[in-house]
């Protein structure tokens, strides 16, 4: 990687107009309130997410309001490393479409568009 590439890639592509209204900021506040933490920056949130992986993903599940017909018993299969591909959210049963299109129940707008030649 050249110095020019390093410099170009370190510049943000986008900065939100209202950083306190971003989902990342709201998620950080959610985690702080739920866990009694005092994460202030994105870097602190990231560091916590990679050191307490199970709590991070459990909080992602809760924050996003993931709907499931059967809840998970374990977030992450214990005793396995990422290179051995552990099982995630064991016991959970969910409908992907329900979660992706959730909140559109009362919307009269199309959820998907399709174009063909």
Feature map (PLM): residue ranges:
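N-terminal amphipathic, basic-rich helices that act as targeting or association modules
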Residues: 3-86
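AMP-dependent adenylate-forming
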Residues: 33-38, 74, 100-117
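Short, solvent-exposed loop/edge-beta patches enriched in aromatic
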Residues: 53, 94, 104-106
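Active-site-proximal, glycine-rich beta->alpha crossover segments in alpha/beta enzymes
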Residues: 79-83, 91, 107-114
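Short amphipathic alpha-helices and their capping loops
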Residues: 90-100
